[in-house]
Amino acid sequence: YGRVINTSSPSGIYGNIGQSNYGAAKAGIAAFTVITAMELAKYNVTVNALVPAALSRMTAGLVGMDNLSDEQKEAMSPRWQAVTAAWLCSEEAAKVTGRCFDVRGDQIGISEGWVLGPTGTQPEDPQDLGPLMTELMSKARLNANMGGHPSGGTGRPENEI
């Protein structure tokens, strides 16, 4: 029996300009979390990761952080990470494993992995994949950090936004 809680980063899940090395390392932590969860399940050990959007000494110098309101600063307090970590260590979370939790203030999300088509299989024809991808993209979080990308970060061409 046990609990492992790793720390990844939004840079490793969603990317951040100028942080390719850091983002790659934190993406590795996310993958490590999923794989070790599989490997340690037989020992009743859960492995999860926090993906914190938190204001700290490390993030204080990032662009835009000095313009945050007091309310935004509170929402990005590291204390929210502690609440999620404590819950992941609880008995209530005994079956939660291999997940990466995006945590920012009163907001929490789960980074999703594989999504299959309506038949439960990957379409073999690109024409058949199109409708599934359109549906998935319509439900996906828009990545506003894709500065300079023609889609403006939506993953869709400008004329379809």
Identify the residue ranges that each predicted region occupies.
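Short, flexible catalytic-loop segment of classical short-chain dehydrogenase/reductase
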Residues: 43, 50-61
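Active-site-adjacent segment of SDR/Rossmann-fold oxidoreductases
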Residues: 14, 30, 35-45, 91-95
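Active-site helix of classical SDR
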Residues: 25
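C-terminal helical subdomain
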Residues: 49, 68-161
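Active-site "substrate specificity/gating" loop of NAD(P)-dependent dehydrogenases
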Residues: 15-19
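Residue(s) in the substrate-gating loop at a strand-loop-helix junction
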Residues: 9
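Conserved catalytic-site region of short-chain dehydrogenase/reductase
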Residues: 12-14, 56
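Catalytic tyrosine of NAD(P)H-dependent dehydrogenase/reductases that use a Tyr as the general acid/base
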Residues: 22
